[in-house]
Amino acid sequence: MKEERPIIALDFSSFEETKAFLDLFPAEEKLYVKIGMELYYAQGPDIVRSIKSLGHNVFLDLKLHDIPNTVRAAMAVLKELDIDMATVHAAGGVEMLKAAREGLGQGPTLIAVTQLTSTSEDQMRGDQNIQTSLLESVLHYSKGAAKAQLDGVVCSAQEVEAIKAVTPTGFTCLTPGIRPKGSNIGDQKRVMTPNQARRIGSDYIVVGRPITQAKDPVAAYQAIKAEWAG
């Protein structure tokens, strides 16, 4: 089921920056935001509690990757923060993914990171020594996530249709690397516009700098939200 709101990546390191950004939006505008490593490691669990207290949904993107027992225990701790979504690295293997699901329980959405959208096929082959195609690697990780009873994967929009063809009905595809037409793609290698992501079947999109660094973040958010809605 498609999330109607684009998820905003809060690419900040301080509580003050985060609060100043969120305060730009009307109180009745309930957002879906992504807290990544930078903000969480700088501010800790309190930043999650603070944002949740405002009524926003929180996607905690820490990409856990460790032995199964450690990941299970860490997810059990994160569950207490009432997060709405969390991530693990699919490369940790099916047993680790199952442990993550056990720790987080069935309430929050749990998705696996396949290949980062900053990774090209040449980089994957050279750095990771994976000699299949990038798409084949993503599909392999996606099938492992489905086997472990995860809700979906993080993937490039270019991979959504192929993933949905090899995973159960309802398997979720969250797409970062979304850029409005004409914007700077930054360090992303595999990008799409909100409209393209919608048409190809993405269930969630994540947008950071085109909103957080816009001259008018609220207007930028509303424009992207409208394009995503179709």
UniProtKB/Swiss-Prot annotation:
Signal peptide: none annotated. Pathway: Pyrimidine metabolism; UMP biosynthesis via de novo pathway; UMP from orotate: step 2/2. This is Orotidine 5'-phosphate decarboxylase. Keywords: Decarboxylase, Lyase, Pyrimidine biosynthesis. It comes from Streptococcus pyogenes serotype M3 (strain ATCC BAA-595 / MGAS315). InterPro entries: Aldolase_TIM, OMPdecase, OMPdecase_AS, OMPdecase_bac, OMPdeCOase_dom, RibuloseP-bd_barrel. SUPFAM superfamilies: Ribulose-phoshate binding barrel. Its EC number is 4.1.1.23. One of its GO terms (cellular component) is cytosol. GO terms for biological process: 'de novo' pyrimidine nucleobase biosynthetic process; 'de novo' UMP biosynthetic process. It comes from the Bacteria. Catalyzes the decarboxylation of orotidine 5'-monophosphate (OMP) to uridine 5'-monophosphate (UMP). Belongs to the OMP decarboxylase family. Type 1 subfamily. SMART domains: OMPdecase. It catalyses: orotidine 5'-phosphate + H(+) = UMP + CO2. The active site is at 63 (proton donor). It is an enzyme of class 4 (lyase). Homodimer.
